[in-house]
Amino acid sequence: MTKFVKKSEISNDWYEIDAKNAVVGRLATIISKIIRGKNKNTYSPHMDDGDFVVVKNIEKIKFTGSKYQNKKYYRHTGHPGGIKEITPEKLNEKNKPSEVLKLAVKRMLPSGPLAKKQLTKLKIYTGENHPHGTQNPTMLELSKLNNKNLIRN
């Protein structure tokens, strides 16, 4: 008989990822799997047993090809003719480099209240420093997972 994990048995770990020269889509897939808990053998789609992810150096994230200038994120205000679009380049000009990764991860999660709760486990910071040092996050090396995860210049 298969057992489900109880809330009292869930343990949340902390992971730290350096986003320097990381490809946005590849980084977002790794983060979404960790946040949902798919990296654990106790994964269950209706339970929130994912881990916390701290991403640093978000301003040094990379896009492949010409997506930095040409990719468009759409949203709608709800009014007629209210469709808005913005590119990653314009988001960086507005000092919102974390929105690019947050949108990518959010759109990889299933929609619903559980996904909103899981998205709060993603902590994004510019620069090297972050306030989560006391949780002793485990450093994830993106290049060791797959050498295509980083862009080498």
Each PLM stretch: what is its role?
Residues 112-125:
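C-terminal structural segments of small proteins and small subunits
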Residues 1-103, 109, 113, 136-153:
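Ribosome large-subunit tunnel/peptidyl-transferase-proximal elements
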Residues 99, 118, 131-134:
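Long, well-ordered early-domain segments
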Residues 125-141:
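Acidic, Mg2+-coordinating catalytic module of metal-dependent nucleases/exonucleases
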